[in-house]
A protein has these predicted regions:
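Alpha-helical transmembrane segments of multi-pass membrane transport proteins
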Residues: 1-429
Length: 429
């Protein structure tokens, strides 16, 4: 019956059925064939959603939508440009810096690409950067969204396996910063080599002060999330609700751009995004129940450990496997299906679960800007095509140097656990 489970799942995916419903169809087919009472389906479906931690997903999503409704994208980019726009490749740095700050609000990569890309790409093109490079840095920097907390993929990984969401958030900060600095260094080298323009006038303190005042409300929200969780003052779910109240206050009373129409749009986008994730979680929990019942995770773990028990080789094999998976499968779906199984392998060779969670999230998130199914790359390319010639192949070529650096950071994080759990333990104990 295991064969039926995987055949139905793969066939459903092949004909275009969404991943969540493919998991559900495969689970139903297995249960009917194995004569398992369907009450088990309902029980495990509900059990997958019965989590206080999962409440922070609609919370962070709604808070990000509220802030974005107030035009936070423009304000963040102006703030970043005021700080670094006067140096060589300054707008590229500003692109990365804005993504790093926006990551602390949204928690997803695609929202970063769409919200910031519509502002960043035309601004870069107008100042003399070529379109493919503008698209590439926008797509690559958007991957910081799910790595710098709050992070929806990290919430999924922690919830599925009983790990601490707060600790995983803290463990993602340094890898996110390393990715950002690595991309900035790459931008500098490429900007010097290609003679990209820079702003001739140094920044004026009045300009920096004005840009900071405009962006300060977004920066405060990032502080609420990071320091509230890091200090043990609030849980991630409580932080998300505080951010919703804060975002509502800022949008209505500070930015004054929140009317009934805008509120409806924010609620609609939030419900659409959060419900898709919740459905995926529920169906994946039923699928995971079946895999556990058939001892699939332990069989895979035993098979890998028969190949080698060397921790470093195991991590290398898992990295290569996840890089491949990330090129074809949506991040959250891959985490829900694969993470519990691979975690059993990693812990068997002595890898810290939090450290391994960051490795898995980084691998799969980087797949968001790699073909053939890189949704962030496609979204950024579509935006760039409005402002000049830019095909998908042009974007991929421009993306290669950034991907090399990003994967280099991935392997550094993989083999230096202090960058993740070491920092998290120092901060949270």
């Amino acid at each position: 019956m295991v064969a039926v489970l995987f055949i139905v799942f793969l066939v459903a995916l092949a004909i275009g059925v969404p991943v969540a419903f493919s998991l559900g169809l495969a689970s139903v087919a297995y249960m009917l064939g194995a004569h398992i009472q369907m009450i088990n389906f309902a029980q495990y479906f509900f059990k997958g959603l019965d989590s206080f931690t999962l409440l922070c997903i609609p919370g962070f999503t709604f808070a990000g939508n509220l802030m974005n409704q107030g035009g936070i994208s423009d304000k963040l980019l102006d703030f970043a440009d005021a700080l670094v726009g006067h140096v060589t490749g300054g707008l590229a740095y500003a692109n990365v810096l804005a993504s790093m700050v926006f990551a602390g609000i949204s928690g997803t990569a695609l929202s970063d690409t769409v919200a910031l890309g519509g502002v960043e790409i035309p601004m870069m093109v107008n100042q003399g950067y070529d379109v493919p490079f503008s698209v590439a840095i926008t797509a690559a920097s958007s991957c910081l969204g799910p790595i710098i907390p709050p992070s929806v993929p990290m919430i999924m990984a922690a919830t599925m396996t009983g790990l601490s969401v707060s600790k995983m958030f803290m463990a993602g900060i340094v890898p996110g910063l390393l990715l950002g600095f690595g991309m900035c260094a790459t931008c500098y080298i490429l900007s010097v080599k290609r003679h990209y323009p820079k702003r001739n006038t140094p920044p004026k303190w009045s300009h920096i002060w004005h840009a900071t005042k405009e962006a300060i409300w977004a920066l405060i929200m990032v502080g609420i999330i990071l320091f509230g969780i890091m200090g043990g003052i609030v849980t991630p779910t409580e932080a998300s609700i505080i951010c919703v109240v804060y975002g509502l206050f800022v949008s209505v009373f500070i930015y004054r751009k929140m009317g009934p129409k805008e509120m409806y749009s924010c609620l609609k986008d939030t419900v659409s995004s959060a419900s898709a994730i919740m459905a995926l979680v529920a169906f994946a929990n039923v699928f995971a129940f079946i895999l556990t019942k058939e001892h699939i995770p332990s069989m895979i773990a035993d098979a890998m450990l028969h190949l080698t028990t060397n921790k470093y080789l195991i991590l290398l094999l898992i990295n290569l496997f996840l890089i491949f998976v990330g090129m074809f499968m949506e991040t959250i779906a891959a985490i829900l299906i694969l993470f519990p199984t691979l975690l059993a392998v990693a812990t068997a060779v002595g890898v810290d679960p939090i450290h391994f969670g960051i490795i898995v999230v980084m691998n799969l998130v980087l797949g968001l800007c790699t073909p053939p199914v890189g949704v962030c790359l496609f979204a950024a390319t579509n935006i760039g095509a409005r402002y000049g010639k830019c095909t998908l192949s042009d974007s991929v070529k421009a993306l290669v140097p950034l991907l090399i650096v990003n994967f280099g950071v991935l392997f550094l994080v993989t083999y230096v656990p202090f960058l993740t759990v070491g920092v998290a333990n120092l901060v949270m104990g």
